[in-house]
Amino acid sequence: MMALDASRPEQIGTLPDSNTAIVVLEGLSMYLTGSQVRGLLQALDKKYQELHILMDVYTEFGVKASKYKNPVNEVGVSKLYGIDDIESITDGLRVRYVKEHSFTPARLVKELTPADRLFFKLLFTGKLYRKIYRLYELIGIVGGNK
């Protein structure tokens, strides 16, 4: 594992060479502007022939709501960024949106106790949850659609 500064996409060049990369960008995008996220995706896109990305994002509304209760407030972060439209970030890149995933798939929610099931359904599924937070799958393949 290597520590890199995501706001400096040129550091992607120091990652090991390979044809394929699987990248998990968790808890990262809210610290980067849209153009910085795009720069990071573009650098990954240039480095690898085949790229699979799982990326979580706060929406712009989610960022505003998180000002009141968010662990990042305790570490001195003063500016957060949200993404409402991932395709506006990937437009023109080989990296493209595949689908949106849920952290709480219905099949797993069904395994919870009735009280927990109700709690999860209210807070972590549906329109309210999607208004705050999203989990995206992205892919980039040489010869794929641009």
For the regions a language model picked out, list residue spans one by one.
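Alpha-helical subdomain
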Residues: 1-146
